[in-house]
Each structure stands twice: as C-alpha cells, then as structure tokens.
Amino acid sequence: MAAVKSCVEEEKIDCDLDFDKVIDVQLDDNHCAKLKAGYESLLSRGALTVTEADFTPNETAESEFFLSLLNSASTKREAKSYLARLKAQHPPKAQTEPTTGHSKGTVTQSLPSGVNLGSFYGASRSVYDSPVFRHDSTPLPPPSELPEERLHLALIKIRTPQLLDDTIINGVAKTLSQLSRLGMACCVVVDPGTAGNANTLRRVAAEQAERISIAVDAQPDSKSAHLDSVLSLSPMFPELPTVLSRKALLNPLRDGQIVVVAPIAYTEDVPKAVTISANDAILALTKELAGLAMRPDPDEDPWLTAQKIAKLQKEVSLDRVILLDPLGGIPSFRGPQTSHVFINMEQEFDDIKNELLHVQSSEACTATTPKGGNTFVEDPLERHLDNLQLSQNVLAMLPSASSGIITSPLEVSNSARTPQANPSDVSAVGTRRQRNPLIHNLLTDKPLLSSSLPMSRREAMNRRRGSINTPSSHTTFVKRGMPLTMIPNPRVEVWTAQNRPRLSLDDPSIDLPRLVQLIEDSFNRKLDVQDYLNRVNDRLAGLIIAGEYEGGAILTWELPPGVEDDGSPASEARMVPYLDKFAVLKRSQGAGGVADIVFNAMVRSCFPNGVCWRSRKDNPVNKWYFERSTGTWKLSDTNWTMFWTTPGLTENSQRFSDYEQVCRSIQPSWADDTGVVD
C-alpha cells in the first residue's frame, strides 16, 4: 500500500481517501507492485474520466474497486469519519520479538507476508503440548492465543432473485465483493417469496443460493460459501429457528468468504428439511450474531451470564442490515417527496406504518391491486410494510450505531457498472457513475441524499449524481435513531403567533443545564445564560430536542423594530417565525442524521408555512443552509446572510422587510462577546 500511497502523493490527487488505511489487507510485494502499476495508470488519466475500456484486463479489477471508492466518498469529512472508524476497528497489533532463532522461523519466513495459514505450516498444538527433552535451552510454554479481531458484518436479504436477470445478480455480487474488500463481511439470505408451495420454494431457494454463490466466485479475489445447514428447529420452539453452529457460520466469514444461506431449517428430533420464511431466518441470524441467542441455565449466576453475552458481542459487530427488494425503498404518500430517504425509527416508525396501512385500505389502493383470483400476487404495500417491520425488529436487537438499508437490486447493480466510453465524446470530462448506495453508506454512514433536502434539490442532485437517464434514487436508510421531543407538541397545539405558549427555557420540562451545554459545545462559545433567558423567554415559539440533548433548535416569534407587542391582530400578523439557535453536539455532527432530524421537525411539523434564520457570511455550514432554504439574502453593511423557507416571501414586500429587520436587529448573548458578530 505504500506504493499506492506514494503514487497518490506524487500525482497530487485530491482524492479524500487514505488508501493505506482503507484497504485493510496485508499485501505481498507482487500484489503491491501490481496495484501501483494499475493505480498509476488510473491517476494519469484522471479519476473521473476513466472507464473500463481504458484498462487492460489485468488492471480492470483493481481500477474498478478504486473508482467505486473514489466516487462514493463525496467529502473529506465523510472519508475521515470512515477512516477513523476503520482505525478503531483494527488497532495495530503488538510487535513481539522472536525468542528462538531457528525453531519456527525457517518455516514461516518462506511464506508470503499477510497470509494466515493457521497451523497448516506450523507445528500443531499437540506438538507443543508433547514433552520435549532439550539440551541447550529451557522449555518454552505454548504460544498464547491472541484474541480474534472483531468481525464487522452486513446481513443481506435478496428478495425473489429468481426474477432477476444475470446482469443484476452479477452487479450485486460485484458490490458484495467490494464491501468485503472494505472490511465488511457479508452474509446473504435468499428470499424466494411466497409464490408456490413449500417444496417449490425450497427448491427455488437452494437454486438461487447456488446461483448467487457462482456469481460471487466469478468476481476477482472473491470466494463464497453456500451453507445449507445453518438453521435448526427445536421441538420445544418449533416456530423459532436458531443457528445450529455459530462456529460453522463465522469461520468462513472470518476467512473472507461471502456466506450465502437459503431459508431452510432442519428439525432436531427427526432430521427433516423445513422451509421457513426469509424474515425468520434474518431474525434468527441477527439474534445469534448480536449475542442474544444464548439460553442460560436458570440457576446460573446472572453476572456470569452477562459476561458470556458480552464475550459473544465482542466477537461480532452486525453493522448493517440490507434488504434488497425489487420494489426499492419505503414510499411516502405525504408531502412532495415520493420516498423516505431516512427513517428515524424511534420517531417515525408508527407514523409511516399507519400511513402505509391507511393507503393500503383506501379505495385508490384497492383499485390498483391486481385482481383475478391469483392468491400468489403480493400487494406491494404489504411488502413495504414487511420491510419496515423487519427493519424495526432487527435494529431493536442491535446497538444504536447499526443501521439498515432498503433498496433495489437494480440500483445496486446499475451503480456497480462502469460507464462505457462513448467514441463520439470529445470532451475531457467523463460521465460520473451513479453512486453505489451500499458502498456510500459504508463510507459515510449516511443515505445517498440528505432527508432534509427540499424535493427540488433532491431531483437536481439525482440528475447531477447519475447519467442523464438515471432514475431518481429510491433507497431508504434506516436507523434505530433517537426520540424527538417538540415542546409544545405541534400535533396537539399548532405553533402560531395567535396561540403562543406560556413557555420559558427554565421550565421544569426543559433540562436547562444540558441545553446550555449543547449550545456551548456546538458553537464553541460560552453563553451568557441570564442575558439569553431575558431575551427569549417572552418570545418562545417552542423547542425541539433530539435524543438526550444531542441536537436541538430554539424557535421564537420576533417583531420588527418599532412594532409594539400589544397582542392585537395587527401586531400578531407582523410576527416573524425565527430560528434563534440550531445546535448539534460536535460528536454528532456529520453522522447519524441528527441535524436532518431536527431540521425536518422544524420545517415539516413546527413551522410548515416557513421560518427564517441568519448565519455569518463566512460560516462553513452555509452550504448546508443554502441547500435547504427557499431563498437567501445577504444583509448589506453586516456580516449576516438571511435564510428562509417561507414560500413566496419575495412577492410580499412588507413581509420580506419584516424578516430582514428581525435578522438585522437580534443581539447575540455570548459571555465572551468581543464585538465580533455571532
């Protein structure tokens, strides 16, 4: 990797990625030289203008991998965040000096560096344990067993692969191979659907598992393991499949193989193959991989049980649950958006489920449902509900850092293809390939598009992200997420100037010290708390809090200078909805979707008719604000830029003037105020 790294530095390519850290494999000199040669060719052409046709067959595999990687990391912050996670996952191994000069060195020195052959070429444990008579030295104890590295894993379900052509299957297999190279082991569960009897489904599942295995094996430096006896059914719990052997499941994953599993379980009392639902297989595998499948003895010490579970959880980290369904992500039937880009389960699960159920039961839905008595035709909304519920059930068993992705095999396959060079193109600028949602999410832990982007911005970015004919992204990123608190609750009481709440920041329902800490951490400045309370307490419109004060927004009703707050309708009509503070803890910035969660709540639930705010002209966050606002205005003779989401604001000169005067007149409340603008 040193060769590749030096190649990047020599060419002065701003690629945002430290490949020395990203490619977490130990390479021998020949492989490293091969990478250097291929990557020099890649960089000499320019990362965004090369295509598969530019490379020899020997170069293509490596160039494909790096091109996909370069394209999927869109910002330095995202790349650095991934590198930090990768570094934490794989701490440097302690170097130990050899204690003997000839006993084992003569065997291991001839092996390629980075190849772990276990005990194949070394002495077995029985040899070490055997008594040995030595003449020249004191007997050495057997070598201590080093703890295994934590396995980072993605659990993937592919629905009805029998309906997908070979091009799509090969594209999915290519992506799985790339994920594996990036340090994410993959376990694939085949879902044959429900169209057929048990025997037919079992046959289809086995055939498709073998088909996917063959496609994976066809990828360069990739190997699959088709496991057909992973799950079992106990007579005591016939409805709950369990993993028959944890070791048999994890060993091929640790060896870098992509495991493929059919939803077939074997009964324990009388060996018999039973077809189970793919969802049950996913839940059983999740429970095992999360360390929750152990059934302790009722008489066992609880502390000992906890220690055993903790040990299992240190072995494996189930980071991603990926559902590949031809229908794609979860659709949205409210608002301008057509699909949910990001779902915060803690906040949105019930609402989205009820929305899908409502549409399913409506006359419009029944009118479009296929008829004709075919009992095997599935309702698309039923499948979306199924994907939503499965994501909820799985993430409930996993740490909050784990996430889910619901997308289509077609989108994954399309983004895995290299755009072909067009002979008629004379421009030096090539078509940028579509970002792969799975690789992008691995690098960034975020969806392809921000969920707080307005619909017009999403469409524009989709057009820019792919080729001219690329369809809009329909991938849903799912997190267990965090609860969201809105005070007062806009579902109970709409936020309007006429019914302003009698609310203050020192209200018992608000943890003021944590709120102050959130603001000071986000802005990196000390707040003059009393001065701030004096300014906003009589003007509060409400408060939004994400999680345990990981993010939040303070919103007020402001009057332009010279307008008296006398409670009259004329005075209330002039009140401006104002975002006074928008804060996210530093540790939650750039990942986790905290800012999107708070912003969405503000513009969709609290102030759907519009809100305004201001920001320093040189604030690096302004790009984020620009993308989410309806309009902006640089305030002359100040260092402020005004933003708003209010439709048609510029058409109402009086309203626009009120917004501008409010943004000009607000005084900051910082304890370290030195006259520099906020």
From Swiss-Prot:
Transmembrane segments: none annotated. N-acetylglutamate synthase involved in arginine biosynthesis. Gene3D superfamilies: 3.40.630.30. Residues 96-111 have a biased composition (Polar residues). The keyword Acetylation does not apply. The gene is arg2. This is Amino-acid acetyltransferase, mitochondrial. It comes from Aspergillus oryzae (strain ATCC 42149 / RIB 40). It is found in: Mitochondrion.
